[in-house]
Swiss-Prot record:
<feature type="binding site">
    <location>
        <position position="164"/>
    </location>
    <ligand>
        <name>[4Fe-4S] cluster 2</name>
    </ligand>
</feature>
<keyword id="KW-0479">Metal-binding</keyword>
<dbReference type="GO" id="GO:0035597">
    <property type="term" value="F:N6-isopentenyladenosine methylthiotransferase activity"/>
</dbReference>
<dbReference type="Pfam" id="PF00919">
    <property type="entry name" value="UPF0004"/>
</dbReference>
<feature type="domain" description="Radical SAM core">
    <location>
        <begin position="143"/>
        <end position="375"/>
    </location>
</feature>
<dbReference type="GO" id="GO:0046872">
    <property type="term" value="F:metal ion binding"/>
</dbReference>
<keyword id="KW-0808">Transferase</keyword>
<protein>
    <recommendedName>
        <fullName>tRNA-2-methylthio-N(6)-dimethylallyladenosine synthase</fullName>
        <ecNumber>2.8.4.3</ecNumber>
    </recommendedName>
</protein>
<dbReference type="InterPro" id="IPR005839">
    <property type="entry name" value="Methylthiotransferase"/>
</dbReference>
<comment type="function">
    <text>Catalyzes the methylthiolation of N6-(dimethylallyl)adenosine (i(6)A), leading to the formation of 2-methylthio-N6-(dimethylallyl)adenosine (ms(2)i(6)A) at position 37 in tRNAs that read codons beginning with uridine.</text>
</comment>
<comment type="subunit">
    <text>Monomer.</text>
</comment>
<feature type="binding site">
    <location>
        <position position="49"/>
    </location>
    <ligand>
        <name>[4Fe-4S] cluster 1</name>
    </ligand>
</feature>
<keyword id="KW-0963">Cytoplasm</keyword>
<feature type="binding site">
    <location>
        <position position="161"/>
    </location>
    <ligand>
        <name>[4Fe-4S] cluster 2</name>
    </ligand>
</feature>
<feature type="domain" description="MTTase N-terminal">
    <location>
        <begin position="2"/>
        <end position="120"/>
    </location>
</feature>
<dbReference type="Pfam" id="PF01938">
    <property type="entry name" value="TRAM"/>
</dbReference>
<keyword id="KW-0408">Iron</keyword>
Amino acid sequence: MKKVFIRTFGCQMNEYDSEKMLSVLAEEHGGIEQVTQADEADIILFNTCSVREKAQEKVFSDLGRVRPLKEKNPGLIIGVAGCVASQEGENIIKRAPYVDVVFGPQTLHRLPKMIVDKETSGLSQVDISFPEIEKFDHLPPARVEGGAAFVSIMEGCSKYCSFCVVPYTRGEEFSRPLNDVLTEIANLAQQGVKEINLLGQNVNAYRGEMDDGEICDFATLLRIVHEIPGIERMRFTTSHPREFTDSIIECYRDLPKLVSHLHLPIQSGSDRVLSAMKRGYTALEYKSIIRKLRAIRPDLCLSSDFIVGFPGETEREFEQTLKLVKDIAFDLSFVFIYSPRPGTPAANLPDDTPHEEKVRRLEALNEVIEAETARINQTMIGTVQRCLVEGISKKDPDQLQARTANNRVVNFTGTPDMINQMIDLEITEAYTFSLRGKIVEA
């Protein structure tokens, strides 16, 4: 049985793709063994991310560390997948000639054939094309290893924000046909999955073709998935404010399985910066979406992405971001220092803000967000939360770990038969990034 080591960088879409790589290899070889140490593997894969500069360089650092393994075992297969693969292509082979296969997100289904071609010809294989339809047509059924599962419903992005490489590495938006999505979710539900997380770089831009040739939009998809037997909770990520329609907002009113947590990236609270980013909305328009959502879901927890130090960002513009964060009360958000990505329009903009100032802004924004996270956690003490038990706690092997609808981790004392089940927990303690709870007796 082939032993496979895979390391995943970046977003949840990459996590989904890594699972699919393991699935196509398992189908090809009649099963595989996933190992946690590279030196135990027959196949080593790095599924890469190019959104941040450090993530990109980390890949080449990791490649350097596995090079001695290749020198000792020439039959070892080393592969680079994901967005760095799409962006760099043949350059990866030039920089690391011991790499055997390089493939993008849209060609992961071709991985087994690429390995065979490498072993037959002795030549490194590179395929970073964009055959979107092919990928979804050739993927095997999902492997189920828990009570929650990701389902990719669309790929790529057509928004072309000035700082972002996704349209260049994942291609234009492409939506899976509705029936394909529903079939995958129904199969997962039959295998015991209770929570579905719908994935896409711009998930709410979903426009899937139906059997009659009509188009199903994202709000309609949510309503259909809501009725699939066995599915008890629904999430989605990542959405774009430009596509956040009133019909999606109404789903939060009508669909109780849709969790009270939303990740909706805004990036900045400054209209000038948003315009320079080519985001396509103003801070006021974003706030209008949130007002509508909280009018029908007052308990909605909202997380977001922020970039500080975007070229030309002034102190006043950063203060506008701070004010927006306080006004909206964001929770559990992700803050990044701007990192210029090659080939994007923003990479050519003048940037005279010192790095030390960018770090200060990062820390200041994180401080405000973490304070709000702590406040929300405190308000949950004494409440009863419906939770999905994910497995053994990462902090204490004698405890179990569960997740609330608003995306909080809860550690509690339980029994192994509770894993992958939905249970009620009373929250007893609150920490910065987790909660402690106890089982509510029936």
